[in-house]
């Protein structure tokens, strides 16, 4: 049990970036997530411009990248609330979809939080989450 907890601690601390806020979506996301020790934020970097972000999304869809693979690992953990935050909604969605589509094992009582402004993104993510028995919380950005 102690070994599992140590592994979980290492995984979570390597995943979390307690750095500066990435913008209003991080604040909004944190406000909507449960305030307990089962909540983690996965901060997703973006490329900096729309063309590069498009290339990054294509890469994430096929190979997952670091953030996608971290999400797959987090999804396997029981009793966890996972928030995905970053400056690009398309990159955030790509990471979430990669994680949901490629997670072979999903823990019990896992929920995913994401901020965005697209109804079609919300529908896609909810469908993928439901297939993996993950509770999806898509917060519509104002």
Predicted features along the sequence, with ranges:
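C-terminal motif of bacterial Sec signal peptides marking the signal peptidase cleavage site
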Residues: 16-19
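C-terminal partner/receptor-binding element of secreted or periplasmic proteins
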Residues: 115-142
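Structural motif
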Residues: 43-48, 83-90, 114-118, 140-142
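N-terminal secretory signal peptides that target proteins for export/translocation
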Residues: 1-4
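Post-signal peptide N-terminal segment of mature Sec-exported envelope proteins
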Residues: 28-49
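Bacterial signal peptide processing site
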Residues: 21-24
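Mature extracytoplasmic domains of secretory-pathway proteins
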Residues: 52-111
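Sec-dependent signal peptide recognition
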Residues: 6-11
């Amino acid at each position: 049990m102690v070994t599992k907890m140590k592994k979980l601690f290492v995984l979570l601390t390597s995943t979390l970036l307690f750095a500066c806020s990435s913008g209003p979506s991080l604040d909004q996301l944190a406000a909507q997530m449960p305030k307990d020790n089962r909540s983690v934020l996965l901060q997703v970097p973006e490329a900096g411009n729309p063309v590069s972000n498009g290339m990054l999304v294509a890469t994430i869809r096929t190979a997952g990248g670091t953030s996608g693979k971290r999400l797959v690992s987090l999804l396997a953990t029981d009793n966890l609330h996972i928030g995905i935050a970053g400056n690009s909604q398309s990159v955030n969605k790509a990471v979430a979809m990669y994680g949901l589509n490629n997670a072979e094992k999903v823990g019990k009582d896992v929920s995913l939080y994401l901020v965005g402004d697209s109804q079609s993104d919300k529908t896609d993510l909810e469908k993928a989450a439901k297939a993996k028995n993950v509770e999806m919380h898509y917060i519509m950005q104002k």
